[in-house]
UniProtKB/Swiss-Prot annotation:
Modified residues (Phosphotyrosine): 312
Organism the protein comes from: Arabidopsis thaliana (Mouse-ear cress)
Gene3D superfamilies noted in UniProt: Jelly Rolls
One MF term in the entry's GO annotations: nutrient reservoir activity
Tissue note: Accumulates in seeds 8 days after anthesis.
SUPFAM superfamilies: RmlC-like cupins (SSF51182)
Protein name: 12S seed storage protein CRA1
Amino acid sequence: MARVSSLLSFCLTLLILFHGYAAQQGQQGQQFPNECQLDQLNALEPSHVLKSEAGRIEVWDHHAPQLRCSGVSFARYIIESKGLYLPSFFNTAKLSFVAKGRGLMGKVIPGCAETFQDSSEFQPRFEGQGQSQRFRDMHQKVEHIRSGDTIATTPGVAQWFYNDGQEPLVIVSVFDLASHQNQLDRNPRPFYLAGNNPQGQVWLQGREQQPQKNIFNGFGPEVIAQALKIDLQTAQQLQNQDDNRGNIVRVQGPFGVIRPPLRGQRPQEEEEEEGRHGRHGNGLEETICSARCTDNLDDPSRADVYKPQLGYISTLNSYDLPILRFIRLSALRGSIRQNAMVLPQWNANANAILYVTDGEAQIQIVNDNGNRVFDGQVSQGQLIAVPQGFSVVKRATSNRFQWVEFKTNANAQINTLAGRTSVLRGLPLEVITNGFQISPEEARRVKFNTLETTLTHSSGPASYGRPRVAAA
């Protein structure tokens, strides 16, 4: 009897553990059955706008079928001149792209020291007991950012942006909700360290909207005063209870943070030294505190594919930026001229989120059933998801078409349907002949006519693109 009881207890324990594991996998993986059975895709626009004093945050509905299938959410930050996006952190990994403008970015990585120190003493605006108090400011790393920069941010790392230029600073970000690092539900949750959001938490669909306040607001003023060793009045000011400026505020006067000079302003010796050592470390000296998290994709000289008459494509993966291995995301930047075509391809191991930064293009996407689920025009500011395995072709219809793709794998791989490195090139002629019921001569043309690997001209003989007419 005791043996039966022990066996039942053991089985019950296994059952509980299995259900817990299954629940965790369901939370971090696909939540709904057949949510990637997509029969139609659409070019998406923002569904909500959070307005602030010096800018706005535009949020896409992450419950849209194609974004839910991809396990991501998407947002666009528009920061006006002298606008400061107050520090916040998310429950998910984030990959951002600077679509327009320039500015400053700072991160606060837990456990890391303040490596930026002011060489001159700082005198605050207040004086204590008749004596002026002087000290040197110290803080963590501050970087210059510009158009084309791709920025990797790990979960829980507080981040802020400042626009020190004259035009708006536009940053688009993808949040990996399905990441193993997200221990909450599949909703993006910003945690604000400063400021308030009177419009509420629009990131969470279906939840009653209440004004979103910063973290300090939830603690008692006495607790804040004791923890920071400040007076009660200052502690209450940290809570921003009567501050309705939003999450992007306007800086009055100069913004005097410690920052390195711009690249063109650095001494020539420093730039030559960096050039001799290269831009990539050997991996031994890079720690979490000093890890490089930014790389620029707008330099054609560093492109992976470049044709002066057609355009260029640049990729960014964990081999270029090692921190991407940790957040398991990567990026691609494309810029093509009118009538240039990106040959049909599919992502072998990742979903892709395509955001148009400039121009227009005609895009076709085909699903696993061989059905065309999207055939339309996409233009600046629109977004479309391309799920794993779905084939896609892009053709520029404006003078220049530029886009950025965020991919849900640190080393995303593509396969092409046409071209010198395509799947058709790898097939024997006999397989093509019998598979498509065409002659050996036609099979040779199918296999060898396209010499390019990625980019080609979409214009050609009048017969291109027309159905083949059967002989009478």
